Amino acid sequence: MLAGCAQPAEQSTEEESGLGAGAVREQLSIVTGGTTGVYFQVGGVLANTITDGVEGQSGSAETTGASVENLRLLGSGEADIAIAQGDAVSEAFEGRNDFEGRAVQSYALAVLYPNVFHAVSLEENAVELGLECFSDIVDTRYSVGAVGSGNEATTTNVFSALEISTSDIEIQQLGYADTDSALRNDQLDAGSWVVGEGHAGLSELATTEDVHLIPMCDEEVSVITAATNSYTEHTIPGGTYPGIEGDVQTIAVWNLMVVGGDFNEQQAYDITSAMFDNIDDFVAAYAPGEEYMVPESILNSPVPVHPGAARFYEEQGVELPEDLLAQS
């Protein structure tokens, strides 16, 4: 699942210190997501890894609205390390969509694991409305995710690829907790969760309600993955969530750990090295990510790799293609 690398937008100002030449930051703010999500768990492990494993530095995981907000915080200098979806990272780097006119220099430290697109309904509603393929959500009450979230951005991209107009749907912009409540209270027919497989909030919903995951049919997957290289075909294995025994076809997008262009090169190397030295701790936080949290996954980055991290990967025998090598 290789992703093509984004091309940087014209930046309004040049990085004052140059690529990788900024001062070492002793206290690092790591922006993640909501407290029930995988980003927060992984960010917490990263914070501990930095504090315990990188001399003279400490990390703190911050709760946020996730991908889009994280990249904005990175761009404004209010965050040092951001965890975000690859589609949002690519758009930020190129200054597209939510980042039009406000490009964010974001370079990869690591590619973590894929976020999986879950289109979630309750079984009773799915049967009544005939939700057999994703496009069947037309004329339903559908939550695309919180305003400004990566969840909303990905859902919007899916709508665009499938030529689904927002005027054909009663759109709601709810976070995961509010989407959960609205489904339970029959205020919503379905909604998107673009999250790590086995997400705790979804598992809890499926424990107490009969949940239906709306599959993406073959043609839908083909159209979406052809529209952008940020997305790949994915199958949610049966048994991932309580009560859902069959496999569910959908799409996925890689998650990245990114820093700004002026992030110190040696510091980037040390943090990337410490992460992989302690990779078992990251796997303990998110077991489904075990097969993905390997150095070779960096080849799926949609943006160039930070020079400090690139040095680490090259030492591990990972040959980075030219489009993943950051240009000063």
Predicted regions: what they are:
Residues 25-27, 51-64, 160-174, 187-190, ...:
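A local structural motif
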